[in-house]
Design a protein with these regions (language model features):
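N-terminal beta1-alpha1 ligand-phosphate binding loop
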Residues: 4-27
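Short, Lys/Arg-enriched, disordered terminal segments
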Residues: 1-3, 38
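Glycine-rich phosphate- or other oxyanion-binding loops that anchor nucleotides, phosphorylated ligands
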Residues: 28-179
Length: 179
């Protein structure tokens, strides 16, 4: 039997991230699991925020498991509420330059999304802290995806919802449902 996991990094309560799953993925929540419209059942894994939580939580998950990482992300120029299907994960190192491994992700199957036409494609930069400024445009910033990808999952896709334009205040309002 294939393993299917939706990975979220909820800092507070699970409701905000669960809302994202219901708003953007085809299916429904039943018995604490996500039932995709195609009949697959997805276990929800809450990692917590940041690299160490990701590694501790996901270390024993089979590398051939199907993983959907869904969550909030900041962006310098995408509108709040934009849906981004991530094609590549990178670490955010604005002050250093060295060759990093390519962390390419699979394409998000359009059948999994409620509104696939709305999904922008982009790079996601993972940072160890909230990003408040950046010269990078047409991308998103989170605190987990590059670390999830670096663990070597073969079937990883990611959907990010822009919560802020590099503003901690905006992020907190959107995450709390004050849109």
């Amino acid at each position: 039997m294939d393993k299917h996991f939706i990975v979220i990094a909820e800092a507070g309560d699970f409701i905000g991230e669960q809302k994202l799953i219901a708003q953007h993925l085809n299916g429904e929540m039943r018995d604490g699991k996500w039932h995709m419209a195609d009949g697959t059942v997805w276990e929800i894994i809450v990692t917590g925020v940041g690299a160490i939580n990701v590694m501790k939580t996901l270390q024993d998950i089979p590398r051939n498991a199907q993983i959907i990482n869904i969550g909030y992300a900041g962006s310098a120029n995408y509108e709040i509420g934009s849906v981004v299907c991530v094609q590549e994960a990178k670490l955010n190192h604005p002050c250093v330059s060295y060759l990093e491994p390519e962390l390419l992700l699979k394409n998000v199957p359009s059948a999994w999304l409620k509104s696939p036409a709305e999904c922008l494609t982009s790079v996601c930069y993972s940072n160890t802290d909230f990003v408040l400024q950046s010269d990078y445009k047409d991308c998103v910033f989170d605190m987990e995806l590059a670390y999830i990808a670096a663990l070597g999952f073969e079937n990883l896709v990611a959907v990010k919802i822009v919560s802020d334009n590099l503003s901690l205040h905006d992020y907190r309002e959107v995450a709390a449902g004050v849109e």
